[in-house]
Each structure stands twice: as C-alpha cells, then as structure tokens.
Curated annotation (Swiss-Prot):
UniProt record similarity statement: Belongs to the MscL family.
Lineage: Bacteria, Pseudomonadati, Pseudomonadota, Gammaproteobacteria, Moraxellales
Gene Ontology CC: plasma membrane
Keywords: Cell inner membrane, Cell membrane, Ion channel, Ion transport, Membrane, Transmembrane, Transmembrane helix, Transport
Name of the protein described by the UniProt record: Large-conductance mechanosensitive channel
Keyword Acetylation on entry: no
Length: 143
C-alpha cells in the first residue's frame, strides 16, 4: 500500500473527519462564546457592580508609566509598560468555564443516548417467552 493511499484511508476515516468538523465548529463557537461573555455577561456584571466597569482596564502596573500616556490598558501596553492584566484573565476564564460547561452538557447528552442504545440492544438479546418455553421443554425431554 502506497503512502498516499494510506493517507487517504486515514484522512477519510470517520473519526478524523468528525474531529475536523469538530475543530471547525469549535472555532466558530469560540466567537459566539467570546461575544456572550464580553457583550452580555460582563456588562451585566458591571451593572451589578455599580456602574461602568471595563474588565480590560483592570490591571496592576508593574513598571513606571511614561508621562503623557493614558492610564488605560491599550495605551500602557502600546507604550511597552509591563502590566498584570487580571481583568483580561477574568474574561478568558469566564469564556473557558462557559465553553467547558457547554461541552460537558453535550458529552453528557451523548453518553445518555449511548447508554439508552446499549439498553435497547440488551433488551433485544433477551429470548422471547416461546424460546424460553422451548428450552425448558427440551431440558425436560433430555432428562
């Protein structure tokens, strides 16, 4: 078998194609999750916290800020000032938790469906009453 035909067989197997589709959908879903966190959840948290709260501008200055530079994350980062950007980390952490929860729920649903199918298969393998009766008669006759 040539290397090219082996690669085709590998690439066209169901698991590899499923993985490729999953990665593409995951990339698109990442944008949805980011928007959910930044455009919906964080503004609600800011409102509850009592006003306009920009998580991106939550940081600790680790160096001296040059004169004339605004004390915002973007301006300080552009000026090369070292920052501990814990606000951005909070946003990314919330993104991760939401994504992990959604994936958990999807896997949980798939496992439930898989278990249901396994139970149905086991039920199908149970012999009917007629078969059980015939086995019993056969055993009594063989004695």
């Amino acid at each position: 078998m040539s290397m090219m035909s082996e690669f085709k067989e590998f690439a066209l197997k169901g698991n590899v194609m499923d993985l490729a589709v999953g990665v593409i959908i995951g990339g698109a879903f990442s944008g949805i999750t980011n928007s959910l966190v930044e455009d919906i959840i964080m503004p609600i948290v800011a409102f509850i916290a009592g006003g306009e709260l920009n998580f991106k501008n939550m940081f600790i200055l680790l160096g001296d800020a040059p004169e004339g530079v605004a004390m915002t994350y973007d301006a300080l980062k552009e000026a090369g000032v070292p920052l501990l950007a814990y606000g951005s980390f909070i946003t990314v952490l919330i993104n991760f938790l939401i994504l992990a929860f959604i994936i958990f729920m999807m896997v949980k649903g798939m496992n439930k469906m898989r278990r249901k199918n396994e139970v149905e298969e086991v039920v199908e393998e149970t012999p009917s009453e007629e078969v059980l009766l015939l086995r019993e008669i056969s055993q009594k006759l063989s004695k």
